[in-house]
Amino acid sequence: MPTDTLSPPPWERIVADVADALIFIDGAGVIRAWNAGAEALFGFSAAQALGQSVDLIIPPHLRAAHWRGFEHAMRRGATSRGAAVRTTRGLHQDGRKLYVDMSFAVVKDADGRVLGSAAMARDATARYLAEQARRAAAG
């Protein structure tokens, strides 16, 4: 089938159905997009998460550092590490602290104005704990 006859990709379905957590927060840090992967990872339904501060999934001891980095990225229009994946902590609805591999991107409109931040996340808890156990056994 020629590609010029294909309709545009169904981005909303892709975002909704991808296994990884996809989250968008606006410039004030309010959750505006939350897919099924985010529901599975953090335990909050979209109805529970949308409209809430992203503090919902950030452990209390990491919130100040998060907000410093977020505000810097919003002012600068870019994250300090680009789209590099980093392992950080997340907070599940049941109170468990997770290890989460996350990448972030500042989202801008067509005129270059910063709209907020998008994050892609994946559970890294099992891998992180296995690495810790290997280090402890080796050392």
Language-model features, listed with the residues they occupy:
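Sensory modules in modular signal-transduction proteins
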Residues: D4-E39, G82, G139
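Sensory-domain boundary/capping and coupling elements
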Residues: P9, Y128-G139
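PAS/PAS-like sensory domain cap-loop motif
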Residues: A36-A49, A110
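PAS/LOV-family and closely related PAS-like sensory domains
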Residues: A46, I58-V100
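PAS-family sensory domains and close relatives that share small-molecule sensor folds
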Residues: H92-D94, S103-D109, M120
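Charged alpha-helical signal-transmission linkers that cap and connect PAS-family sensory domains
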Residues: K108-D111, Y128-L129
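PAS-family sensory domains
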Residues: R113-D123
